[in-house]
Amino acid sequence: VTDKRYAQYFGFTEAEAKAVLEYYGLKLDEEVKAMYDGYHFGKEEIYNPWSILNYADTGELAPYWVNTSSNKMIRKAMEGRDQAFARGYEELIEKGKLETLVRMETSFFEVSSTESLWGLFVNAGYLTIEKVISARDGRYVLRIPNEEVQQEFRDLTASYLNVSESDLSAMINGLRYEERERFAQSYAD
């Protein structure tokens, strides 16, 4: 996912997404971009092809990516994680991005370290690389790529924190609007 030579094989470029949508009488507007764009492969902006094709077919802006697989693998990998992962995850949710060490060459069966888990998140499409700090050292800035995946993150986060989605929304709003007491109350409930 970091090699620009292969970027075009991971999804649609903007020109390709635009051509597909125009063929079906749809436009590639800001709302579509916010929902399905946001992946970075190499230095290329890439759209989720599954979601673009489903949107072209139905004309309905909806989260199609979540239906491609279960997030059970990610949930299982997150179980029993150490404080380093918990702090990083909280920063990601609070700030929308995270600078961290990432081990890209990993599989589900090798997720023994926090760096490997972040690599699994990237390789599974939950996160994208916003910026390469040091490829040699494996240091990247990661972020949630788009609104479609953000919706899935809400469910994943509720499960990780063992809270309801409504409590999670209250917690996130407390963080977002710097209402620490509101966040603490939601977390305590």
What is the meaning of each model-derived region?
Residues 1-189:
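Phosphate-binding site recognition
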